[in-house]
Amino acid sequence: MYTKEKINELMEKAQVMKKEMEKIQKDIKMTKIKGESGAGLVTIFMNGNYNCRKTKINDEIWNEKNKILIQDLITSAINNAVNKITELQKKKIILKTPFHNE
């Protein structure tokens, strides 16, 4: 049976965890992520909110003949950046939860 003290303790822990999660979310939003494809031929820069901030396309592939390739590389670079943000979120959140066993 839960006592008033136990309930208060749980509420305090929940508040601490909420503040930690807010800090993690803020940190992730401020993080800059670089996604690449084609061995660096296309680079996408995003922030932790999944907003694309910049796109770089290497001069080697920048011509009319490579249009389809460039489109594929841009898509791949965006997906690479999104995957990095997702992994960063998982790592930061898991490290701050009581489920982490380290």
UniProtKB/Swiss-Prot annotation:
Presence of the UniProt keyword Transmembrane helix in the record: no
InterPro entries from the UniProt entry: YbaB-like_sf, YbaB/EbfC
GO cellular component terms, A-Z: bacterial nucleoid; cytosol
Gene3D superfamilies cross-referenced by the UniProt entry: Nucleoid-associated protein YbaB-like domain (3.30.1310.10)
Domain of life, per lineage: Bacteria
Subcellular location: Cytoplasm, Nucleoid
Pfam families: YbaB_DNA_bd (PF02575)
UniProt keyword annotations, A-Z: Cytoplasm, DNA-binding
One GO MF term attached to the UniProt entry: DNA binding
Role, per record: Binds to DNA and alters its conformation. May be involved in regulation of gene expression, nucleoid organization and DNA protection.
Family: Belongs to the YbaB/EbfC family.
Subunit structure as annotated in this protein's UniProt entry: Homodimer.
Protein name: Nucleoid-associated protein BCc_301
Organism: Buchnera aphidicola subsp. Cinara cedri (strain Cc)
